[in-house]
Each structure stands twice: as structure tokens, then as C-alpha cells.
Regions:
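Alpha/beta catalytic cores of group-transfer enzymes, especially the acyltransferase/condensing modules
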Residues: 122, 132, 139
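Internal active-site segments that recognize and position negatively charged phosphoryl groups
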Residues: 143-177
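A glycine-rich beta-to-alpha transition motif near the start of alpha/beta enzyme domains, typified by
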Residues: 1-121, 167-187
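Glycine-centered structural positions embedded in regular secondary structure
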Residues: 47, 130, 156-158, 184-185
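Flexible, glycine/proline-enriched loop segments at strand-loop-helix junctions
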Residues: 80, 130-132
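Short glycine-rich anion-binding loops that position phosphate/pyrophosphate groups of nucleotides
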Residues: 12, 132, 164
Length: 187
């Protein structure tokens, strides 16, 4: 692999390899992303985020050409619409690398649509996540979620905010406290 200038960033215990590629010259592939995210052979991260102007990506076609686009890849090499923690890290990266001012907000492009990020000071950022999309809300649920600490899988409703989530209703806070969330739930 050739030399690659990168920044490592993290937000709420998710870490990312960030690449500044304003002119869209960097070739990313699933294999390269998996290598970069590999914690033994590569840099190690939950994902790769490339900062690129929208005009240089097919996915950026619906945005103003000068819009910064968050080209987000999961650690398995798959493309993702966006990541809530990643978009805040991306904003800090744009302040540092591109000199962007976010105190009045900056609209960025993602595969999940536009997101507006505003710097709050002290390294904190607010993100307008856009509209959510529900799964089969009329049915009340559309998935089953199994998690350590529950004796049986529970019904869940899919909620998409640019990346998928599943919401499970629990009877009490004690029930929540009894879950082992160090292991990903099975959907």
C-alpha cells in the first residue's frame, strides 16, 4: 500500500480513520477499507470517513458541488448512509483540515441526505439528523431482537435515521439495567 495521510478520530467510543480528499483523487475499495480498519494489520477503526467535495462522487449528485460529502464506509468494507457519531467527528475534522467554521452551522452531504452540524464549543457538536423513517409502524413492530439479559427475543420497531436502529420497549429501568449491552444484540 502506498503512503496515506490520515487522521484518527473518535466520538462516543466509535473510532474512525479520516481521509482528506477534497478533489476526489483517492481510490477507496472495500478491500482497502477493511485493511485500514483492521486493528492488527491496519490502523484499526469502526469505519473510514473520507472528506470529499460532492462534485467528485456519484453519491454527491443531489448536493451543491461545493458541499462537503461524508463518504462513510463500515469496517467490513460496505458503504453506509451515515453515522451519528461519525458526523460529529467529521465536523471536527473539517474545522481542522479545511478551516471550516461551524459556529453558525455547516450543511454536509451524506448518503442519508443533508445533515447540518453546528459547533457548540468545547469540542462538542450538534447534528440535525433529519427525518426518521419507521419500519412497519402500523403493525407495532417489524423485527425481533435478542439481547443478553432477556430470556426471549422481544418485538422491535425499525427506525432509520440514516442508519438502521431497532427500538425495543422494556417494562422498567431495572430491566434495562439487567441487559448486557457489551455484546451486540441479534436482530
Amino acid at each position: 500500500m502506498n503512503r496515506l495521510r490520515f487522521t484518527k478520530g473518535h466520538g462516543t467510543e466509535n473510532d474512525f480513520v479520516l481521509l482528506f480528499d477534497e478533489h476526489g483523487e483517492l481510490e477507496l475499495s472495500p478491500e482497502r477499507v477493511r485493511y485500514l480498519c483492521d486493528r492488527r494489520a491496519g490502523i484499526g477503526a469502526d469505519g473510514v470517513i473520507r472528506a470529499v467535495r460532492a462534485r467528485h462522487l456519484e453519491a454527491g449528485a443531489g448536493f451543491s458541488p461545493e458541499t462537503w460529502f461524508m463518504d462513510y464506509w463500515n469496517s467490513d468494507g460496505s458503504l453506509s448512509e451515515m453515522c451519528g457519531n461519525g458526523v460529529r467527528v467529521f465536523a471536527a475534522f473539517l474545522e481542522h483540515e479545511a478551516g471550516e467554521r461551524l459556529d453558525r452551522g455547516l450543511t454536509i452531504g451524506t448518503r442519508g441526505g443533508e445533515r447540518t452540524v453546528t459547533a457548540l464549543g468545547d469540542g462538542r457538536y450538534a447534528v440535525g439528523m433529519g427525518r426518521y423513517r419507521l419500519g412497519d409502524a402500523d403493525a407495532g413492530f417489524d423485527a425481533q431482537v435478542a439481547v443478553r439479559g432477556l430470556s426471549t427475543a422481544r418485538p422491535a420497531l425499525s427506525v432509520d435515521v440514516g442508519n438502521p436502529h431497532h427500538v425495543v420497549a422494556l417494562a422498567t429501568e431495572d430491566e434495562l439495567a439487567g441487559l448486557d449491552l457489551t455484546v451486540a444484540p441479534h436482530v
